[in-house]
Amino acid sequence: MGKLIMWNIITLDGYFEGEKSWELPFLEIVWGAEMESFSLAQLNNADYLVFGRITYEGMAAYWKTAEGEIADFMNRLPKIVCSRTMDSADWNNSTLIKENVAEEIAKLKARSNKDMYVFGSANLSETLIKENLFDEYRICVAPIIAGNGRYLFSKGLPERKLSLISSEQLKTGGVIAKYESLK
């Protein structure tokens, strides 16, 4: 069975996007050869990419026409989009889950040989945190205090104890921390 892994990039003060959806200027700060290598390693070990609607729409709009090794992975890998409001998912290899999201993700996880990655998707991530489905959290902290935006984790989530697996400092100043969920 593969693991369900959250992957996100946040600012030092905890924001994963600006005040507007897809406002992500801090990504440029941490992106470089190391982050590209890290991203490719994750994609190479993925059975599925899992998104909420907003992240799915943004990712699809970008990656459908992008070129390069990461784009090839993003377009080739099976994608799961969890949304009650979408009627279809047209990005290559996409499957739409409209109901019983946690139950359906748990079933996919049980059948997976490799890992499943949730990128962005704060609302979906909250659902999966509440259901205690994440096995691992991978967070890259960008060396910037944004001062405002949307927090990755909202108030009122249940406590989840974690254990640090590893941390890696990037030449860009970012730090990737990997935490295991202590279910």
Identify the function of each model-found stretch.
Residues 1-183:
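Enzymes that bind and transform nitrogen-containing heteroaromatic metabolites
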